[in-house]
Design a protein with these regions (language model features):
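Amphipathic alpha-helical hairpins
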Residues: 3, 9, 13, 33, ...
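Rossmann-fold dinucleotide-binding core
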Residues: 39-121
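ATP-dependent carboxylate/acyl-activation modules
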Residues: 95, 234, 239-253
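Rossmann-fold NAD(P) dinucleotide-binding segment
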Residues: 1-59
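Helical "substrate-binding/catalytic lid" subdomain
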Residues: 108-230
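Residue-level detector of anion-binding/catalytic polar loops
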Residues: 4, 58, 100, 140, ...
Length: 253
């Protein structure tokens, strides 16, 4: 195998991929290319990549962002870090996975992914608060959604994830367990670099509450369900809301 692509739950699992009993370091790594798509710790991954490169391999970090429907369509975005030599060796495979966004040296892809998810989780929590406030003040959720789009508060999360609240499934294609794992990694990065992160701390607490109330398998947007229930309102809206897992690949008939 010349190129290995990995995408697992988190730091412990990716460390096992490289250094476990049957890990890559147990075989010849010379001239092999390792592309990792996992959301993980930049510090840990830079250390693991050095071990792989010391064994003769090339490392690329390419954590993905988007959604399940992005993966189905084949247009996921990858935050790609690594040397130019490694990138050229990996380019054909990367181009088949999705779209690349170059972020510099190895490890920067993990940084980009974590701060991307930092904004995403804060925004998801804020959407729940705004929707509940709007509903209690007399503005219906579907009207709120339409007037927010195109304004200063517009975003991918607003367009993509609010329908999962309307539908009442809260998008189980990305579990709250995974969202909380990402927030734990973000908190580690915040502590490592000693930055202020009050909004991140608040979102972290909201997602912890959602996990405790609804369980690991609940959808990521149950953070909004939590705020709904605490506000004693219902944000569901009748409509033909297409779930992310129902999206078709462009070549499917």
């Amino acid at each position: 195998v010349d190129i290995v692509v990995s995408m697992v739950f988190g730091p412990k699992e990716i460390e096992d991929v490289l250094k476990g009993e049957n890990g890559m370091l147990q075989t010849s790594c010379k001239d092999k290319v390792w592309i990792d798509l996992t959301t993980s710790s930049p510090t840990l991954m830079r250390s693991l990549a050095k071990e792989f490169e010391d064994a003769g391999g090339y490392s690329i970090d390419a954590p993905v962002t988007g959604s399940l429907d992005s993966a189905i369509r084949g247009d996921m975005i990858m935050f790609v870090g690594g040397s130019e030599i490694a990138l050229e060796k990996a380019r054909e495979v990367l181009d088949r996975i999705g779209k690349t966004r170059r972020v510099g040296k190895y490890g920067n892809g993990y940084v980009a992914k974590l701060v991307n998810n930092q904004l995403w989780k804060i925004h998801a929590s804020a959407i729940g608060e705004a929707m509940v406030l709007a509903k209690k003040a007399g503005l219906e959720p579907d009207v709120w959604w339409e007037v927010m789009k195109g304004g200063a508060a517009d975003s991918f999360v607003l367009h993509h994830d609010v329908p999962s609240i309307f539908a009442g499934h809260y998008d189980p294609s990305f579990r709250v367990e995974l969202a909380l794992k990402d927030l734990d990694l973000i908190q580690e990065l915040v502590k490592e670099h000693n930055t202020r992160a009050e909004l991140t701390n608040s979102a972290h607490e909201r997602f912890k509450e959602a996990k405790e109330r609804y369980g690991d398998e609940a959808g990521e947007m149950t953070v909004c369900k939590l705020i709904e229930e605490d506000g004693n309102v219902n944000l569901q809206v009748d409509g033909d809301w297409i779930a992310p897992w129902e999206v078709k690949h462009p070549n499917d008939k």
